[in-house]
Amino acid sequence: MPFIVNTDADRESMLHATGVSSFDELIVDIPREVRLNKALELAPAADEMEVRSILESMAAANRSTADYVSFLGGGAYDHFLPSAIKAIVSRSEFYTAYTPYQAEVSQGTLQAIYEYQSLICRLYGMDVTNASMYDGATALAEAVLMAIGVNGRQKVVVAGKLHPWNSSVLKTYLEASDHSAVVQNVVEDGVGSIEVLKGLMDDTVAAVVVQQPNFYGCLEDVEAIGRLAHEHGALFIVSANPVSLGVLEAPGAYGADISVGEGQPLGSSQSFGGPYLGIFSVRQELVRKLPGRLVGMTKDSNGQDGFILTLQTREQHIRREKATSNICSNQALNALQAAVYLSLLGKQGLSEVAGQSLSRAHYLAGRIAAIPGFSIRYNAPFFNEFVVDTPIPPSEVVRKMLEKKVFAGCDLGEFGDEGLLVAVTEKRTKAQLDMFADALGELA
């Protein structure tokens, strides 16, 4: 960043432009008790070698999956990332999160986004996918806002166990509405109760939301939930783990109107929580209500294929009240990572990743269930994640496993729940699974 001077003359000019005579007058609305009335006391300037040493010592305090065996999940997963992903997305032509507005000089980036959209449509079994959303949580919230805008209804029913953070983001998005309400279905044995859900449905429901697999890792009865939604004229919104679709049926196959998801498992590292990728797909009839950006294929004046931004119904292009969303910059770089990941693996490769994650998770669950004092809480089918009841507080399990360089899983106490949420990916070897089970056995 270039150094820009701030001279006395510059400051006088700025104060004059704002109509005040002094800096104190400019900040008069800031209470005096919260103002800094002394020097910042910054550390002395350091040269490059000193700065590198300081930062390396700070980074050494981190605990990462490079050094620890990870069973963390809950929305962010430790999948293997081929080296080619970073090599491709780090190219200067791609290395930006911003949308290419000038189509005539951005055909490569636009085509890459178009390929991402096409791959996600195939994976989720949907007709149209946008260029990306911020993350899975905001994609879900935008899907609900879209449903309310489509049918004009106000009630939203969450059919099963949704990630608590996704629920929080959804409620935040709906706070500005005077009428919208979120109703949570009863969860029994890890999944939403279909019988209770029937009683929640009426002609005021705008959308029925389900996460598949759900927050506990269990598989919801999505076909029954979808039928109930459509019987009452509501839109059916599915938030699906994209890797799970290597072995599970695509949302479009069981009637989803809108499919969203957290795209982190598709080529993005866990990265201490972000940036991630929001997947957003719809059926064709809803395309004009689709939030975010959409890349389409067209013909130029010479009859050659070209790529453009199409259906740009965002607020900076039309009146705010008519806009489909207010998303600005997007996650194009993460979308590119997802496209590269899916292209490298192919259909069979993704199925193998999903299949290995599933089989290894079930092997570990069997090992843990055999340990005295430990049990698998739910009997419902699961993909690669499950809840374990422990003989000692889960927080203690997590702490003791750190001593063995193992991330034991997510302590559900952080979400006002109980138990340990354990996730397994294709990266976990049988030796690591056995080591973890044996270490848990020492705690029994």
Swiss-Prot record:
Database matches in Gene3D superfamilies: Aspartate Aminotransferase, domain 1, Type I PLP-dependent aspartate aminotransferase-like (Major domain)
InterPro entries named among the record's database cross-references: GcvPA, GDC-P_N, GDC_P, PyrdxlP-dep_Trfase, PyrdxlP-dep_Trfase_major, PyrdxlP-dep_Trfase_small
Species name: Chlorobium luteolum (strain DSM 273 / BCRC 81028 / 2530)
Pfam families reported for this sequence: GDC-P
Keywords: Oxidoreductase
GO MF: glycine dehydrogenase (decarboxylating) activity
Catalytic activity: N(6)-[(R)-lipoyl]-L-lysyl-[glycine-cleavage complex H protein] + glycine + H(+) = N(6)-[(R)-S(8)-aminomethyldihydrolipoyl]-L-lysyl-[glycine-cleavage complex H protein] + CO2
Keyword Oxidoreductase included in the entry's annotation: yes
Gene Ontology BP terms: glycine decarboxylation via glycine cleavage system; nucleoside metabolic process
Top-level taxonomy: Bacteria, Pseudomonadati, Chlorobiota, Chlorobiia, Chlorobiales
Highest taxon listed in the record's lineage: Bacteria
Subunit structure of this chain's protein: The glycine cleavage system is composed of four proteins: P, T, L and H. In this organism, the P 'protein' is a heterodimer of two subunits.
Presence of the UniProt keyword Cell wall biogenesis/degradation in the record: no
Enzyme Commission number(s) of this protein: 1.4.4.2
Protein's recorded name: Probable glycine dehydrogenase (decarboxylating) subunit 1
Stated family: Belongs to the GcvP family. N-terminal subunit subfamily.
UniProt function note: The glycine cleavage system catalyzes the degradation of glycine. The P protein binds the alpha-amino group of glycine through its pyridoxal phosphate cofactor; CO(2) is released and the remaining methylamine moiety is then transferred to the lipoamide cofactor of the H protein.
